[in-house]
Amino acid sequence: MAFLDNGNHTAVTEFILLGLTDDPFLRIVLFSIILCIYLVTVFGNLSTILLIRVSSQLHHPMYFFLSHLATVDLGISSSVTPSMLVNFLAERSTISYLGCGIQLSSAALFGTLECFLLAVMAYDRFMAICNPLLYSTKLSTRFCIQLVVGSYIGAFLNDSCYILSFAFFLFCGPNKVDHFFCDLSPMMELSCSDASVSGVVISFTAGSITMTTLIVIVISYFYILITILKMRSTEGRQKAFSTCTSHLTAVTLYYGTIIFIYVMPKSTYSRDQNKVVSLFYMVVIPMLNPLIYSLRNNEIKGALKKQFYRKTLL
């Protein structure tokens, strides 16, 4: 639709991303920093996926979900970071209509998947701590696969709202996107067609998913906390807390940023603040998650040592 003419107006076929800054020196500095972050993100998440796959002691539901979370983190970061790095070095930061749609769609898809997987992982911790005797029975391989497949289906359904909305937007005027990627809000501002209905639908679906998954997480940890407080063994409490700390940290970072970006009224913060928080959410958090889940996890550290030891003997 972006390639059709609208009366006397020529439809926009490419967009200019204004990015984070116009300063040439800052662009080089940001390029260097974000490139390092992206390389650590790719290495950390790929290492997590491969370690879980090759280590038999990590073939449990918790690590099955963690491997999918690492895949999603790779997807979130890769949906925007490579093009952002290229734009830092380009004189004119442009993106095609199709490229913009793909970027918007992939960011929405992986962002939704992260919400679902964090909720699934909270349920996994609830079953492991509150119902340990039923854990292996309830979270069978088949059920774990069903939870992950359901997460992907839910994410694709939500993503279809973004795809359809973007497809029906008509861009015939300004083509400067005041962001470092094609986020929905600045794209709606550029649309010549009425985007109010699309905005309401997407706000409802995205808000419903955010709140529903957050409620699942809160309820799960409410029962986990009650169970931990009832434990008589100090060692048992510490072990239970340690298994939840990593996940709670990841949840706090992720939901804190998306609530700031998509739930808080836009009048309470500036566009530049939105860019910084979006950068943290899409670039920094995917790098931090492998570190968060590995530094406090003795099973992952043990599996990593075992693999290194095995390599040195070969």
Curated annotation (Swiss-Prot):
Residues 1-28, 79-102, 158-199, 262-274 are extracellular. Glycans are attached at residue 8. GO terms for biological process: G protein-coupled receptor signaling pathway; sensory perception of smell. Disulfide bonds join 100-192. It is a multi-pass membrane protein. GO terms for molecular function: G protein-coupled receptor activity; olfactory receptor activity. The chain crosses the membrane at residues 29-49, 58-78, 103-123, 137-157, 200-220, 241-261, 275-295. Residues 50-57, 124-136, 221-240, 296-314 are cytoplasmic. Pfam families: 7tm_4. Coiled coil: none annotated. InterPro entries: GPCR_Rhodpsn, GPCR_Rhodpsn_7TM, Olfact_rcpt. It is found in: Cell membrane. Its main location: membrane. GO terms for cellular component: membrane; plasma membrane. Keywords: Cell membrane, Disulfide bond, G-protein coupled receptor, Glycoprotein, Membrane, Olfaction, Receptor, Sensory transduction, Transducer, Transmembrane, Transmembrane helix. Potential odorant receptor. Belongs to the G-protein coupled receptor 1 family. This is Olfactory receptor 5P64. It comes from Mus musculus. The gene is Or5p64.
